[in-house]
């Protein structure tokens, strides 16, 4: 029994070392934004490449999350609906609500230097 426990402990230790030494194998952190009172919060979100951003509509009426360049576009999100998009390329992504075009915000994607 001790031999089996020893193998399990060794395996877990190896896994931990692999995760620590190979940060590119670890997924980029996810980020969240909300839609409330005709506003995207935060208005400017900075993330690393590989990050998935999830927007949640906390307003009482539908909204969309639409990239100015049409790179991403949600359907109309009712209250508590979500939309997610993974940003793989560094850059600045301006977006708006297609139902209320004065609602605007930006996602800034920085290079994920840990992945190199």
Regions found by a protein language model. Name each.
Residues 2-9, 15-16, 23-116:
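Extracytoplasmic copper-binding redox domains, predominantly the cupredoxin/blue-copper superfamily
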